[in-house]
Amino acid sequence: MFNLGIITISDKASRGQRADRSGPLIKESLAGQDCRVVGYEVIPDEAALIAERLKHWADSGDMDIILTTGGTGLAPRDVTPEATLSIIDKEVPGLPEMMRTSSFSATPNAMLSRAVAGVRKGCLIVNLPGSPKAVAECLEVIMPVLAHAVDVIKGRVTEHPAPGG
């Protein structure tokens, strides 16, 4: 069982001008998984605020994983990757690489994603896209490895058996 936080990053949703559909979709998609959502926020596309929330949640020790949604594209206010990179201790490039690779079969626009993933103080942070459809696709890709990632980060797994045995 791992604890999860969800941060939706959207100017319009944070001002109440649009409903957040991606954050609730993440919650729904994880129902029945071996995790518990312990935090959920909607904040604007402000790099300093994003970095502060990520630091606060990761440093609290209450969350094993933080999933962000939104702010990973090319628009001028899309700053989630920069905010994430500014606070992580190490990158985990395989997660966003596989999300982009998998999503590319649905849309070539996946190449434009700048999502990143990394670890800060024992907490895995993963940027997801903002579109509900893209969120669902990316969650399907990363869900099978999240529990193992948490176990490795927490030091509960020290040896990895060779494939096939």
Regions found by a protein language model. Name each.
Residues 1-165:
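Non-catalytic beta/alpha edge segments that cap or flank active sites
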